[in-house]
Amino acid sequence: MKKIKLPSKVTVGAFEVELICIPHDISYEVSESQGAFVGNPPYKIYLDENIINHGGKDAVNVVVHEMLHVGYYQYSLKDKDEEAVVNAYGNFITELLSRSELKDWIKDNI
């Protein structure tokens, strides 16, 4: 069965985010992480290509984790109370799983 490829961009609400896979060594040397969200337009998420190419739940976890940073930024959650954060993330995740370009890739990798 053919695997669904990670989309090159994801649109959630008014935000369009470019997904960029980078070599594992650079990912760890530059940010010591598996992914990084750039919160200035044009919005980008850099992802460790080894994890993404391997696929599965670990890849989904990294992508969803970085997309949640987008939601945090998009909904201005820095100084919000728990209910506002939970409500915003509920809405954001629903949008991510139901209408974004990532929905089929996520389903294929879980």
Provide a role label for each language-model segment:
Residues 62, 66-70:
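Catalytic glutamate of the conserved HExxH
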Residues 2-57, 70-74, 78-91, 110:
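Active-site scaffold of zinc-dependent metalloenzymes
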Residues 104-110:
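Long, well-structured alpha-helical subdomains associated
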Residues 95, 99-102:
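Acidic/histidine-enriched, beta-strand-rich ligand/metal-binding domains
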